[in-house]
Amino acid sequence: MERVLIVNADDFGLSKGQNYGIVEAYRNGVVTSTTALVNGEAIDHAAQLSRELPALGVGMHFVLTLGKPVSEMPGLTRDGLLGKWIWQMAEEDTLPLDEIAHELACQYQRFIDVFGREPTHLDSHHHVHMFPQIFPIVAHFAAQRGIALRIDRQTVLNADDLPSDLRSTQGFSSEFYGEEITEACFLRILDASAHRGEASLEVMCHPAFVDNIIRQSAYCYPRLTELEVLTSASLKAAIAERGYRPGCFLDI
């Protein structure tokens, strides 16, 4: 059975170092897709690079935890900025869902304005779209527009919650992250997916060159390690040996 493998690099547009790392991992490695933060400091730079790489799938990385929102969000921001207090608000069930739905539409339009095309798919920074309160908003938004959505099926409590016409990969892994970033780790993800019989798999990654913006991230130098592994010739060969076909979300 042929399996489609999407290796999606998150955080396109976060910084120039992030952008260059993603492009390097696409040109000389196994990355096939990326998702862009439209409020990132280097989003225009990301869009410029993407025009030179028309085969690179570019989706939208919905942001509710970093930087300035595109629209006014008084119910979620503090001093005009987004932040990680969204987790506490989710636990307290005090999320401003109308503001979030409006911000999603505004970020989507901003993506189209910057990239000149619709995104191939949607996911989110820090996986906030998988919050139980937010997921239905994003899932129906994606389904209405006919674009795919990253779904962590271990988080979705009920498959009936998914719109029938929503596209996604059968499998998703965020395990290529943290302290153990190795070729063996990546291949274990593929083998586990194949064992489950999944015909399509998305693996999340964050390859980057370190710059001043990346240094401010709690997840900094492992991004360099990711880049090294993802551009390994032996990894590309091992993926091919396992019968995976590189693809993007337009292929599912």
UniProtKB/Swiss-Prot annotation:
- Which processes are annotated in GO (biological process)? chitin catabolic process; diacetylchitobiose catabolic process; polysaccharide catabolic process
Which co-factor is required?
Answer: Mg(2+)
Q: Specify which residues bind Mg(2+) according to the UniProt entry for this protein.
A: 61, 125
- Keyword Iron attached: no
Catalytic class of the enzyme = hydrolase
Domain of life, source organism: Bacteria
Q: In which pathway does it act?
A: Glycan degradation; chitin degradation
Catalyzed reaction equations: N,N'-diacetylchitobiose + H2O = N-acetyl-beta-D-glucosaminyl-(1->4)-D-glucosamine + acetate; diacetylchitobiose-6'-phosphate + H2O = N'-monoacetylchitobiose-6'-phosphate + acetate
Subcellular location as annotated: Cytoplasm
Pfam families given in the database record: YdjC (PF04794)
Keywords annotated in UniProt: Carbohydrate metabolism, Chitin degradation, Cytoplasm, Hydrolase, Magnesium, Metal-binding, Polysaccharide degradation
Q: Which GO terms describe its cellular component?
A: cytoplasm
Q: What is its EC number?
A: 3.5.1.105
Q: What is its main location?
A: cytoplasm
Is Repeat a UniProt keyword of this protein? Answer: no
Q: Which GO terms describe its molecular function?
A: chitin disaccharide deacetylase activity; deacetylase activity; metal ion binding
May I ask which residue range the UniProt record assigns to the signal sequence?
none
Q: CDD domains under this entry? A: YdjC_EF3048_like
The free-text function statement in the UniProt record for this protein reads:
Involved in the degradation of chitin. ChbG is essential for growth on the acetylated chitooligosaccharides chitobiose and chitotriose but is dispensable for growth on cellobiose and chitosan dimer, the deacetylated form of chitobiose. Deacetylation of chitobiose-6-P and chitotriose-6-P is necessary for both the activation of the chb promoter by the regulatory protein ChbR and the hydrolysis of phosphorylated beta-glucosides by the phospho-beta-glucosidase ChbF.
NCBIfam families, sorted = PRK02134.1 (NF002559)
Family, according to the entry, reads as follows: Belongs to the YdjC deacetylase family. ChbG subfamily.
Subunit structure as annotated in this protein's UniProt entry:
Homodimer.
Any idea what this protein is called? Chitooligosaccharide deacetylase
Species = Salmonella enteritidis PT4 (strain P125109)
The protein's gene is named chbG
